[in-house]
């Protein structure tokens, strides 16, 4: 039975209802600082923690609850006679419930504050209390999540106590929270690319209907710190997002964020099927659609500019899973909302430089994101590309980095007309891209040509210019073919494998 509770919260959501309920059950409430003031001002009978400890708050609030008279009351095991004898001798009263939420370090670390100001939001007393309460969960109920208040109130109403299963779960939530909290602090202080221990701080954003396939359970977690596109987007319409939706949306958004020009990316199964740049959203959508009018069906379309009504009307003509853009004209949004299942996503955050992670069985691979497009660009053939061809070559290289290797993209006038990817050899990827394009001006490759066969195949289809990293021991073979066929070729020095 709960006789004494300690309440100290930064987030005051729901705390009055909980405190007044406890008061109605004759529970003695101890509190600190701002929480004490808030409860007292709202008519709750509450004891200042200084009355319990006999020691005033000190060091600008850094020391409030760090006292044996508090922690002895939390940690004492009730059915341990020696424990109870000791706390009685020391004048310590047991504390049966601890309600604490922490200083909002997750949020403050991203604000425009000085380093020292951010450090002040590293909570010490709160974590110490909740860890102590969680360790002694058989005797102490610990609440760190405002969403748990109602359930605990209901259990006490029904049973006069909180059952052991709930206590254990609440204790588990403490250490789950502290892992994320400590991870965020560790990463803030270390500032290391690859620390000795990889600690990640993510919070569940939503449960998903299923994973990649219906038999796989899934959930979506987002970073507790920082601003990221796939964390800060807003869903304006449509069904709940699926596991595959989020993965696809991420790649589609990253693709359009590559471009300063107005850009559109149509994507299916995590691979672009049509990408285009131009002067207006309507133009780039039309061009992206024409790249592959079959594969776009049931796919995702992303823009890096606001969507207008005319474009929305064209988008509404076909079945799409998602449309994502920085914004939508009001009348464009009304058009898209007529398709109740279409997920309309507003995403204003640009794709960020960061880390890529891939889970393997028993480990995690971590690498810098592929944010470097070119190194030392040089023409290696007798013929040089024209100005327009060079623009298309750079465009193609920006697209090919988002296609699964081996990858080839064929481009004409700012359109990725043919995309070939996921092949185990480069010539197959080239044949796939060239065949899909039908016609094209330039060809981009994510990695070097191991033989001259890709250049030979490109010549058959009338390709005028090629861009690739270079670096093969047989580079001269490809250069020779290009010179013989009148094709210009540019080496970039940067490979863009995507596995």
Curated annotation (Swiss-Prot):
The keyword Hydrolase applies. Keywords: Hydrolase, Multifunctional enzyme, Purine biosynthesis, Transferase. The gene is purH. It comes from Clostridium botulinum (strain Okra / Type B1). GO terms for molecular function: IMP cyclohydrolase activity; phosphoribosylaminoimidazolecarboxamide formyltransferase activity. Pathway: Purine metabolism; IMP biosynthesis via de novo pathway; 5-formamido-1-(5-phospho-D-ribosyl)imidazole-4-carboxamide from 5-amino-1-(5-phospho-D-ribosyl)imidazole-4-carboxamide (10-formyl THF route): step 1/1; Purine metabolism; IMP biosynthesis via de novo pathway; IMP from 5-formamido-1-(5-phospho-D-ribosyl)imidazole-4-carboxamide: step 1/1. GO terms for biological process: 'de novo' IMP biosynthetic process. InterPro entries: AICAR_Tfase_dup_dom_sf, Cytidine_deaminase-like, MGS-like_dom, MGS-like_dom_sf, PurH-like. GO terms for cellular component: cytosol. This is Bifunctional purine biosynthesis protein PurH.
